[in-house]
Each structure stands twice: as C-alpha cells, then as structure tokens.
Amino acid sequence: PRSTQGLSSAASDVYKRQNLEFKKKYNSKILGSHADRNRIPGIDILLEENQKHKIGNLEFEVIFIPGHTKGHIAFFFKKEKIAFTGDTLFSLGCGRVFEGTHEEMFNSLNKIKNLPPDTKIYCGHEYTNSNLNFCLKYDPKNTHLKDKKINIEKKLNSNQPTIPSTIADEIKTNIF
C-alpha cells in the first residue's frame, strides 16, 4: 500500500522541504498545524488541538505542543499507544526553544508526560546516545538511567534502533 497522507509536526526548514518532496513523490496530502497554515507550504488538511483524524484504520488525536516552534503538534494514536512528538520530546532530551517560550515548552512537555505510561514515543531526531551522556552528567546516581545506558549500548552494538522510548521510561530517566 502507498502512503496517502503525511503528518507534519513543525515548521522547520528541513520538514518544509521534506513535506513538499513527500507530497510530490507519493501524490499525497499533507496534514499540519492550523497555527502553521501560512508557514508550511503544501499543507492540505489543517489540524487543531484535540482534533481526531483517521488515516485508513488508524485514528490519532492532535496535541498542540508549542515551544520548539509556535505551531508544533504531536500525533497520539491512543489505540496503538503511540505518540509522534516531533522535535519537542526526544529520548532522554527535548528540543530547543526556537520560536516559543520556555513556559510553553514546559507546558508542552507536561502534556506529553500525561499520556499513558506505556505510550511509545517516536521523536523527530535520534539523539539518544548524546542525550544519555548529558543526563548522566547531571543525574549520575539515577539507577534507571544507568540501566538505560546498558540497554542503549547493547542496542547500538547490535545495530538496533534506540527508539521508541516510553512515557514511563522518560519519566524515570529524562532530566527534562
């Protein structure tokens, strides 16, 4: 099956370019934040906070999470227990505050934190190993973090991805 819709979480230059390439290559619709309607070229379907949308048999809810960018959104697939958090929450870290405020970022991270603990987190970038070293520097006695380091090293040595993480794991190990 081919992709008929692409999800866009933020108005970053990389994502803007990728959205247009995806749209052209797959003749697909792009879904993005209503707040970014004038900033992301090619958005066909505008999404707002708490809105539910279906792609095939999959339904997701839109979570408005400004901070990294003004119109940043996440996609929460409740039935599948999966959240795509873009550049707001990473495994063991969080995105930079480029356009929003630190208060917005803090509130957005708390929204994500309140998802069910077993929710799998898929982030926009893979910075897990460098984020791990940062967290260990500031929380060196965290036994959960030490265990996660062993797990991450095993995965990396086996050429396995370190993503997804879970909400429960991030609460125990992510200093943000």
Predicted ranges, named:
Residues 26-28, 119:
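A short helix->loop->beta-strand "cap" motif at the edges of active sites that frequently abuts
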Residues 16-25, 42-43:
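Metal-dependent catalytic neighborhoods of phosphoester/phosphodiester hydrolases
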Residues 110-120, 129-176:
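Accessory terminal helices/loops
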Residues 40-139:
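Catalytic core of the metallo-beta-lactamase
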